Amino acid sequence: MVAQRARRRKRASATQLYRTCKASGTCPPDVIPKVEGTTLADRILQWGSLGVYLGGLGIGTGSGTGGRTGYVPISTRPGTVVDVSVPARPPVVIEPVGPSDPSIVNLLEDSSIINSGSTIPTFSGTSGFEVTSSATTTPAVLDITPASENVVISSTNFTNPAFTEPSLVEVPQSGEVSGHILISTPTAGTHGYEEIPMDTFASSGTGTEPISSTPVPGVSRIAGPRLYSRANTQVKVSDPAFLSRPSSLLTFDNPVFEPEDETIIFERPYSPSRVPDPDFLDIVRLHRPALTSRRGTVRFSRLGQKFSMRTRSGKGIGARVHYYQDLSPIAPIEDIEMEPLLAPAASDTIYDIFADVDDGDVAFTEGYRSTTQSRGYNTTSPLSSTLSTKYGNVTIPFVSPVDVTLHTGPDIVLPTSAQWPYVPLSPADTTHYVYIDGGDFYLWPVTFHFSRHRRRKRVSYFFADGTLAL
């Protein structure tokens, strides 16, 4: 008979021993370092993690996640995924068809016979209809007396809310019957409303009151483009194509449509060999143009964005460039010399009131003709006269006021009847220079003062609202 050996009992795990022997201090030497993570392998991992990054692999001494798939705690069972199966549909029962059964399935159910109504009467015989004739000659009398019953005409109104004007909506009426209030209304609403008296506000005022409750203080202005900041690089463009076709300075392509007043966006920065103008290298965006005045010039400006560097995330980094071109300088305001509006015509006679009166040629003809005197014009205030007809008005515009001596003379009464030609009478006294309110004015040669010595003398003549004899 062979004796059976006693079964070996399994030793408790390190975690179970650590819970019971830690407090009493009777733990084996390999339990505490294993549970607390102070073994030689753990220390090597701690020292190596200072210089090597092993993130995402689940290797370390900290409380990690166990990598991508996680880990199962000690003395526990891994979780299982419960597979929930979808219930299958019940099979369709297939009816067997025998060889004698019809293979065509009727779409309509069997219906009962519908009664077609009464039968059609049948006629027998060939005699046809019988016509009865009478020899009575009495005329037929018809009773046309109206009936004695009264005819009542009634009308009914139906209200349609969809076609009811707002100005014709009636106020709902209320009536009380046996202590119950009944509301009836022909409108679309289902309840009555309450009339609230309206008050009138601001019945009087000065007209300067604000139209809003909180007026905005000051004037809001739109900020202009900041073209001359330190963050923008200033580049002057001398090519005239910058005004009409700025994309031609960046690429040799000929676009079909190029907006003039909008932002131009390029898909990618072109290589240096494909850029006609090196100032437009790495440009990916040209903003809309702006006209500004800078130091006495009209300037055409566009702000450009460069794409010089790309980060790992794909974002482009570049400087901003201000491209400008001066169109024309703004000239200062010049003083314009004023000229008289009524310039003397070639056929007008110019009279110089400051002419030298001395020995000279004086043309005087017999009869009532005009006397003309030509002298040197050394003054800046000429007088012009325009003679439209024989009895025309004389206009003398003075540039500066001049003191003129006015001499009165005898009055000549004009005739009441107009006769043509009209010959004015000669006044008896001819010692005056100009006759005011007369039929005509005369300039006699004897009135000029002739001196034996050549000297300058001022002679004042005054013509106002008068006529000259031709």
UniProtKB/Swiss-Prot annotation:
Posttranslational mods: Highly phosphorylated.
Primary localization class, coarse: virion
Subcellular localization, as worded in the UniProt entry: Virion; Host nucleus; Host early endosome; Host Golgi apparatus
One Gene Ontology CC term in the entry: host cell nucleus
Annotated function: Minor protein of the capsid that localizes along the inner surface of the virion, within the central cavities beneath the L1 pentamers. Plays a role in capsid stabilization through interaction with the major capsid protein L1. Once the virion enters the host cell, L2 escorts the genomic DNA into the nucleus by promoting escape from the endosomal compartments and traffic through the host Golgi network.
Recorded family membership: Belongs to the papillomaviridae L2 protein family.
Subunit structure of this chain's protein: Interacts with major capsid protein L1. Interacts with E2; this interaction inhibits E2 transcriptional activity but not the DNA replication function E2. Interacts with host GADD45GIP1. Interacts with host HSPA8; this interaction is required for L2 nuclear translocation. Interacts with host importins KPNB2 and KPNB3. Forms a complex with importin alpha2-beta1 heterodimers via interaction with the importin alpha2 adapter. Interacts with host DYNLT1; this interaction is essential for virus intracellular transport during entry.
Protein name as it appears in the record: Minor capsid protein L2
